[in-house]
Design a protein with these regions (language model features):
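UBC/E2-like fold recognition across ubiquitin and ubiquitin-like conjugation systems
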Residues: 1-67, 77-192
Length: 192
């Protein structure tokens, strides 16, 4: 008689870790939705400023009123291996993938560690979500031209870039106005 060797997902093997992730993510990031298919993933938008300090002026304008849209994908090796956080809105351009200054890997996931060994299996996924929200701010700073590269440690625990947010938002305002005007003109042209 042969036994069936059917693979099970990490969340079936470690229900207590699934419960912990759910509890922590739902408390801090209520707009994310969990899908338990395959190895499972979370999707949705992060808050614009979930950091543990006052929000600097200009965040809403810099982010166009919306936090980073993401997919957090688990692998069968979770929690030993960290999940991947993939930015979906905004989605980095193809030429930004694998360039160190953008902190995006070739598989389109964010580079949130110096090395994969920096992930501790007992760490919370919410630490990655905070880093991803910080990545969105830094991405906006690069796009606005007030920075040429992202910081090595991120802005989650470092407020040294906060003063640049309002400047970046001011630089982006004329671009946003032009884009809106162009879109309105195009729409008028199609309705005539």
């Amino acid at each position: 008689m042969t036994e069936s060797t059917q693979a099970i997902s990490w969340w079936q093997a470690e229900p207590s870790r699934l419960a912990r992730d759910r509890r922590e993510i739902e408390a801090g990031f209520p707009d994310l939705v969990l899908t338990l298919e395959g190895q499972g993933h979370w999707s949705g938008h992060l808050p614009m400023w979930p950091l543990d300090r006052p929000e600097p002026p200009g965040v809403t304008d810099l982010l166009h009123g919306r936090g980073l849209g993401i997919a957090v994908s688990y692998s069968a090796a979770y929690p030993v291996v960290s999940p991947y956080v993939v930015p979906l809105d905004p989605k980095p351009l193809a030429e930004e993938l694998t360039q160190t200054r953008w902190h995006v890997l070739g598989n389109e996931a964010l580079c949130l560690f110096q090395t994969q060994a920096d992930w501790d299996p007992s760490s919370s996924v919410t630490d990655l979500l905070l880093k991803a929200a910080g990545w969105r701010i830094e991405y906006g700073l690069l796009k606005a031209g007030v920075r040429t590269d992202m910081t090595m440690a991120g802005i989650v625990y470092d407020d040294s870039l906060d003063h640049l947010i309002a400047e970046a938002a001011t630089r982006l305002a004329p671009v946003a106005e032009e884009t809106t005007a162009t879109a309105e003109q195009a729409e008028e042209g199609t309705t005539r």
